[in-house]
Each structure stands twice: as C-alpha cells, then as structure tokens.
Amino acid sequence: MKSVITTVVGAADSASRFPSASDMESVQGSIQRAAARLEAAEKLSANYDAIAQRAVDAVYAQYPNGATGRQPRQCATEGKEKCKRDFVHYLRLINYCLVTGGTGPLDELAINGQKEVYKALSIDAGTYVAGFSNMRNDGCSPRDMSAQALTAYNTLLDYVINSLG
C-alpha cells in the first residue's frame, strides 16, 4: 500500500536521486498530521458499525428502494445488508488510508473500476454518495474526535464522494 513516505522514496529511487528538500517537507508534513490521522482511525475502528448503519438509514430515507438505478432492490432487508456491507468495506479502506497517510488502499481496492461495477449491477452511485455525505455531515468535533482528526476523516470521505461523482 502506498503512503506519502513510500511514494517519495519510490519517486526518488526511480529517478536515481536522493529525496529533495520538497520531498522531505512532504514527508515531514505527513508525519506531523499522523497523530490526527491515527486518532481518526482509532475512533473509526471503534464506531464503524454505527457509522455504516446511519449511512444506510440515510440512503433508504432518501431512496426508499435503496438504489436509484434501473432495477430497485427486490428485498429491502437484503438490500440494506448489502448496502451496509459496502459501507463497512469503504470505511475499512478509509481506516487503512488514515493509518498509512495516503489514498493507496482506496485507489487500489475500491475506486479503480467502481463506476463500471455499479453500472453493471444497475446501482446508481448516487446512493453511495448520499451515504458518504451523511457520514461526512454526521461527524462532529469535539464530540466524535478532534478538529484535526475530523478534517483527515472528512478529506478521505470527500475523496470517495468525488470519485463516485
């Protein structure tokens, strides 16, 4: 999985050079933000099930059939379970990104090819956007986590939302 550190080192190595001053500044910034990212990862690990369930509830409140594609889900219970499973999967990848300090886990294990998969399954990505937007708007500092941790978490949610758009 890629992180800022592995990306910087890999780029320098590919160019047969030592990391530059700007490379080192990038790594230093990542290290300085690490405490906030790890706080967000810890809070997410402890609350992922409730976060995913609130997202599912928001999706089904906005889209009663659970999908806005061509084929509404046949069984609301099964659809909700699958929707929650998908949100939990994304939250786990977001957690990995918070730990590594990069978007590699999301890029490699979720974002690449997601639009094609959703289209093939007749699932409108808008349902996921609604759920991720709910997650983003539901987070509160200092109730849930510090402002810096919430920013790190929300940045990754925005990354996912934008990839679906």
Curated annotation (Swiss-Prot):
One of its GO terms (biological process) is photosynthesis. Phycourobilin binds at C75. (2R,3E)-phycoerythrobilin 2 binds at C140. GO terms for cellular component: phycobilisome; plasma membrane-derived thylakoid membrane. It comes from the Bacteria. Belongs to the phycobiliprotein family. Light-harvesting photosynthetic bile pigment-protein from the phycobiliprotein complex. This is C-phycoerythrin class 2 subunit alpha. It comes from Synechococcus sp. (strain WH8020). The lineage of its organism: Bacteria, Bacillati, Cyanobacteriota, Cyanophyceae, Synechococcales.
